[in-house]
């Protein structure tokens, strides 16, 4: 058996230029945290919706739930309470919110690294809905749930 193998002592693995670059460590938040609230009046079977204005950053003219971004370190239930009040003037208690749905998106208008939206349902609130952000919303109103499509 020979003592010297060919290329003995030379490195076998060699770096090539066609390797994909290593991913950079994530320094910023990977996910934007968002809260939305379905205010549902079960006695009249209506929910509060906002129509986005022509000045809105996206989805102009479309109908939406009261929704908004979480502040750093803010509990998501507090985000829901704050955004609902800022947009509609309605007040809910954090403990009365129930998780209705969670949406994860890989990309969003203000979330190029993805977003997570927690949709809450509220059946108890105080106040009457009003358009508190007319630059962002054309109108705020109660909408009968019978008007919603039943399938997508």
Label every PLM stretch briefly.
Residues 36, 46, 139:
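Conserved beta-strand and immediately adjacent loop positions that scaffold enzyme active sites
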Residues 91-101:
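A short coil-to-beta-strand element that immediately follows conserved catalytic motifs
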Residues 2-36:
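Acidic, metal-coordinating catalytic segment for phosphate/diphosphate chemistry
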Residues 32, 60-65, 94-96, 113-117, ...:
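Short connector loops at helix/strand junctions that flank enzyme active sites
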Residues 43-45, 101-129, 141:
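Active-site-adjacent beta-strand/loop module that shapes the phosphate/pyrophosphate-binding cleft
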Residues 119-121, 130-152:
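NUDIX/MutT-family hydrolases
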Residues 45-86:
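Conserved Nudix-box catalytic region and its N-terminal flanking loop in Nudix hydrolases
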């Amino acid at each position: 058996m020979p003592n010297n193998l060919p290329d003995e002592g030379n490195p076998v693995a060699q770096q090539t230029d066609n390797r994909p670059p290593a991913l950079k460590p994530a320094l910023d938040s990977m996910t934007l945290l968002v809260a939305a609230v379905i205010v549902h009046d079960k006695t009249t079977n209506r929910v509060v919706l906002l129509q986005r204005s022509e000045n809105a950053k996206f989805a102009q003219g479309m109908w939406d739930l009261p929704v908004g971004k979480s502040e750093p370190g803010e509990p998501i239930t507090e985000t829901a309470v704050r955004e609902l009040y800022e947009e509609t003037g309605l007040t809910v208690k954090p403990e009365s919110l129930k998780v209705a749905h969670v949406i994860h998106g890989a990309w969003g208008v203000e979330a190029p690294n993805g977003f997570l939206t927690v949709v809450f349902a509220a059946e108890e609130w105080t106040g009457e809905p009003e358009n508190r952000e007319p630059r962002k919303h054309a109108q705020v109103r109660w909408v009968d749930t019978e008007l919603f499509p039943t399938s997508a």
